[in-house]
Curated annotation (Swiss-Prot):
Phosphoserine PTM positions: S71
GO biological process: intracellular signal transduction
Name listed for the protein in its UniProt record: Leucine-rich repeat-containing protein 40
One GO CC annotation: membrane
Organism taxonomic ancestry: Eukaryota, Metazoa, Chordata, Craniata, Vertebrata
Length: 602
């Protein structure tokens, strides 16, 4: 009955008179017919300069196929059509929309991104069921006040427009959860924004903001706040009261001081690189109990406090391009997976150690803690034993640091004496890197109940044997610079593995078994011959945050990879694909993922 009521008062001959002629070839009748069944219509990338009238009237006019069959017994019952709920008209040449938009009151999704729109019609207020509105990549200078009538709106994407201010009454969008205002010309954020109490994600990056309102702390559900690339000189202390905040991006601003976060106990990532921060103190660190990523690159830091050891959960620390001359040795006791130090005038760590990577730097710092302990004469007897090969195994490292280290010996096998030295001690890390190993040492199996980190990089491994696959507590595995072209399916049993480094090997595809290790957070597989990845399987890897595919043979990047929204670092340089263009890659992971998502066919 609702359908008959809707067309009451309309010219019932409208569908016969204009239904087909108005659309011409721009919208095939078959597409409209399918849309009446599914409630979804995708007209993206059709070079449209205006929306055909038959689209606005899809649920009003009698369809053309009614000419051929008016029988109530027909299989195709056009009068039982579904209201259009999803309309995608992105990637066209639209300069305006008409008020006929009101003829689609059932819309829940309207996607008109990547057009040439300078305004939105006031009739948009009548789309009261709208939940997602994407108007990004247009030329909007202002938003109509009527947009505040969309009380069911949950996602609003306005990035890459020419907005200079926010409409009055914007705070009435009380159900809004995801708001993207990045890449506009905003100079202020109204205090009334704080009334957006349902907001979970707010992107204000690449604007001209000089300050944030103190009232921002009322956004009690906000988890993701991106203020990169603005003109912020200070952060309101009230921001420290945002108890749900997990990700905070403040890169490329003019901050001179790092804010304190006494109530942000859930904060996992803090990005404050490319500012003018001169000092890092204990007060800045002591409340960051959950922090996993701390980005302080390109600032003016001169030192790192000993209290850095308080960040027990820290995994990635970027200190590159500062004025740091020394590091606290206690930094070596953190379980970092990534430590960037380039561009600092460090006097206490040789450049060759830094060039060997994170684990070598941490190992060096730990060794300096040891050097500050027993005297040299004591350590000669306590920390090493001589093997038949005249090499030494560091007993002190086994006992105090729980590391079995037999690296940089150019050995073709690991002597039994190395494993014998463990005795009844607990060992959590194995470092057999920089040798000539052609196979996994079989006696590693003896340590399967305790080892979490294994470094077998810079060897001559051409296959992985089952000895490695039984290390069920393994969280970190470094296999770079070997001769590997595959991984065994049995590696699926490594149910705690978080980081794997396969760079500089001979892989032609991402090993299938990796898609089934759902605990993986970091995959480094640069400098191989990888020709493809499976975005559908990768989307299932919900913990994956870092994927390095640089310098491979990728001829194309599947748009569906953009759905891997948990990725924080996606590196694609040095591949032969043409799109995304280099300019997109330079904008970083978020821009790459957005670019890919915008090109997913629907």
């Amino acid at each position: 009955m609702s359908r008959l009521k809707r067309i009451a008062g309309q010219d019932l001959r409208a569908g016969f008179k204009a239904g087909g002629r108005d659309c011409g070839t721009s919208v095939p009748q078959g597409l409209l017919k399918a849309a009446r069944k599914s409630g979804q219509l995708n007209l993206s990338g059709r070079n449209l300069s205006e929306v055909p009238q038959c689209v606005w009237r899809i649920n009003v006019d009698i369809p053309e196929e009614a000419n051929q069959n008016l029988s109530f017994g027909a299989t195709e019952r056009w009068w039982e059509q579904t209201d259009l709920t999803k309309l995608i008209i992105s990637n066209n040449k639209l300069q305006s929309l008409t008020d006929d938009l009101r003829l689609l009151p059932a819309l829940t999704v309207l996607d008109i991104h990547d057009n040439q729109l300078t305004s939105l019609p006031s009739a948009i207020r009548e789309l009261e069921n709208l939940q997602k509105l994407n108007v990004s990549h247009n030329k909007l200078k202002i938003l109509p006040e009527e947009i505040t009538n969309l009380r069911n709106l949950k996602c609003l994407y306005l990035q890459h427009n020419e907005l200079t201010c926010i409409s009055e009454g914007f705070e009435q969008l009380s159900n809004l959860e995801d708001l993207d205002l990045s890449n506009n010309h905003l100079t202020t954020v109204p205090a009334s924004f704080s009334s957006l109490s349902s907001l979970v994600r707010l992107n204000l990056s690449s604007n001209e903001l000089k300050s944030l309102p103190a009232e921002i702390n009322r956004m009690k559900r906000l988890k993701h706040l991106d203020c990169n690339s603005n003109l912020l000189e200070t952060i309101p202390p009230e921001l420290a009261g945002m108890e749900s905040l997990e990700l905070l991006y403040l890169r490329r601003n003019k901050l001179r001081f790092l804010p304190e976060f006494p109530s942000c106990s859930l904060l996992k990532e803090l990005h404050v690189g490319e500012n003018q921060i001169e000092m890092l103190e204990a007060e800045h660190l002591k409340h960051l109990n959950s922090i996993l990523v701390l980005d302080l690159r390109d600032n003016k830091l001169k030192s790192v406090p000993d209290e850095i050891i308080l960040l027990r959960s820290l995994e990635r620390l970027d200190l590159s391009n500062n004025d740091i001359s020394s590091l606290p040795y206690s930094l070596g006791n953190l379980h970092l997976k990534f430590l960037a130090l380039e561009g600092n005038p460090l006097r206490t760590i040789r450049r060759e150690i830094i060039s060997k990577g994170t684990q070598e730097v941490l190992k060096y710092l730990r060794s300096k803690i040891k050097d500050d302990g027993p005297s040299q004469s004591e350590s000669a007897t306590e920390t090493a034993m001589t093997l038949p090969s005249e090499s030494r195994v560091n007993i002190h490292a086994i006992i105090t640091l729980k590391i079995l280290d037999y690296s940089d010996k150019q050995a073709t096998l690991i002597p039994d004496e190395v494993f014998d030295a463990v005795k009844s001690n607990i060992v959590t890390s194995i470092n057999f890197s920089k040798n000539q190993l052609c196979e996994i040492p079989k006696r590693m199996v003896e340590l399967k109940e305790m080892v979490s980190d294994v470094d077998l990089s810079f060897n001559k491994l051409s296959f992985i044997s089952l000895e490695l696959c039984v290390l069920q507590k393994l969280t970190f595995l470094d296999l770079r610079n070997n001769f590997l072209n595959s991984l065994p399916e049995e590696m699926e049993s490594l149910v705690r593995l978080q980081t794997i480094n396969l760079s500089f090997n001979r892989f032609k595809m991402l090993p299938e078994v990796l898609y089934r290790i759902f605990t993986l957070e970091t995959i480094l597989i640069s400098n191989n011959q990888v020709g493809s990845v499976d975005p559908q399987k990768m989307k299932m890897m919900e913990n994956l945050t870092t994927l390095d595919l640089q310098n491979n043979d990728l001829l194309q990047i599947p748009p569906e990879l953009g759905n891997c929204v948990n990725l924080r670092t996606l590196l694609l340089d040095g591949n032969p694909f043409r799109v995304p263009r280099a300019a997109i890659l330079m904008k970083g992971t978020a821009a790459i993922l957005e670019y890919l998502r915008d090109r997913i066919p629907t």
